[in-house]
Amino acid sequence: MTDLLLGIDIGTTNIKAVLATPTGRIIAQAQNDYPIHYPQPGWAEQDPADWWRGVVTVTRVVLAQAAVRSDQVVGIGVSGQGCAVTLIDAAGEVVHV
């Protein structure tokens, strides 16, 4: 099976992935939850590293479920949880305000 499409949704509480054919037949799907941190009352934040680990995890899971190679994926679509801005410093570390 070749020409597969990978859809990734980075949501508020988890990441979901779907592997499908160009005609829309779902081959595999997976999700990975991650925490919301509350550093003080009225604040909520997430660690972008959790998002990345989640993307890697669900991608590996759907590829394994479908028993396909990554080079069979010809397109990737990503949706996110709204307009989120992640500030990083020169070393690539998250800046906490």
List each model region and its residues.
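N-terminal glycine/serine-rich phosphate-binding loop of ATP-dependent small-molecule kinases
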Residues: 1-97
